[in-house]
């Protein structure tokens, strides 16, 4: 993978000049000048997904120049490097192969001279056997009762991905009740334990090293709670499984290592739902649906790795994002799913994007002088319309938005879905085209009112429009289409990281806070005043000690 400063490319200089030409052009003008704009700036994927990027401040020339940027930064070479198992995560000397986990073609993928696919398939088969025993009721707890509840204990990628997917795929779930615990705040595990029965609960402890502070603190609390009822430590093996590679620590915890499901260093945490970390997904929706999830992602992987840039959906969305982030100065992107099952989708890609591309050091080890990853946020529609859309419509900040919705709902109650989708379509139209002063005044005339008498109100009802959006319309949210959608965003993030010359797959930014917390923790064990930090941190710790006494 080549290390190329994007701002030093001729394409970047051309884009800067092009921005000067485009910055005052409106989306309304672009549509007025091209009756075929939708056809030119939209694409479908497998007749399952329509991506409409026509309501953006772009022209064919814009996309051509952005594609030149992708060529000059050798995006094609980087894609080939990732899919072929090269160690593109150089700061950790690791390959990046979440694509291998969903490689349904089963073509060999070589890391360090070894095909990883036999091990991937073996873990999948092991998860299949285990999950079928749990779901069927064949697996019994220590009192002979079948499992009714599953508690996934993990944090970050070991929590956000499985939680998001099990929520999105609720229409496919079986009889097992899923719970997710991540926060080291004891309230999280305490509230979940109130809901479950130790005789019928299975705990999944998701930690590659089996040393993650938050996860192991919660796991030991769950174990202590369980043993208060079960008594004998041998019963732990019937109620705990591990998603880990540390067989020694897993065995010491009391888990049978036969129920330890491995994954590999080339699986990044925020890309791990496709691995053994996805066991909670399998237990929720069944193995066949998990395979469909993998298959959808694999289909998008093939699209991403083989489709020319001008028709490649992850690349197109990534380039449009760079256009706003690096030329228009937009600092955030909103992900707005019009489907309640997707209520954790934005939170998932908040981690996916911000932990991946929130870097200020480039691949050469130098501080960048350009913007890297955007701030990602969002909530389901229509809730967001009654919360933060005001700022998107009439605020002073540009917020490019992705609107996502299924054409077919899993819950066809009355006309709910038509009302939901009417809002989905209306919002992107309103953001793009706005409402002029003339229209506001005419609306008053149509109501029999004199606009002159309401001059004090008219300016506040004007919408400038020209707010950019992408619309992603799915035929229906299924395991397959969800897999494709997740992979679409994963590859968008990768593409932006390549072009911006940063390492997308490490996360050193999470380390300093953890190191300092480990230093502070022993200082909280007594009531002595602390003076070893700055005055602010000392003051906070000492007030905490005074109040807890």
UniProtKB/Swiss-Prot annotation:
Alphabetized Pfam families for the sequence: PGI
EC number per UniProt: 5.3.1.9
GO molecular-function terms, A-Z: carbohydrate derivative binding; glucose-6-phosphate isomerase activity; monosaccharide binding
Domain of life according to the entry: Bacteria
Reactions listed under catalytic activity: alpha-D-glucose 6-phosphate = beta-D-fructose 6-phosphate
Alphabetical UniProt keywords: Cytoplasm, Gluconeogenesis, Glycolysis, Isomerase
Active site: 355 (proton donor), 386, 514
Pathway(s) served: Carbohydrate biosynthesis; gluconeogenesis; Carbohydrate degradation; glycolysis; D-glyceraldehyde 3-phosphate and glycerone phosphate from D-glucose: step 2/4
Single GO cellular component term: cytosol
Entries under InterPro entries matching the protein: G6P_Isomerase, G6P_Isomerase_C, Phosphoglucose_isomerase_CS, SIS_dom_sf, SIS_PGI_1, SIS_PGI_2
GO biological process, one term: glycolytic process
Keyword Cytoplasm attributed: yes
Compartments where located: Cytoplasm
Function: Catalyzes the reversible isomerization of glucose-6-phosphate to fructose-6-phosphate.
NCBIfam families xref list: PRK00179.1
HAMAP family to which the protein is assigned, alphabetical: G6P_isomerase (MF_00473)
UniProt family annotation: Belongs to the GPI family.
Protein known as: Glucose-6-phosphate isomerase
Gene from which the chain derives: pgi
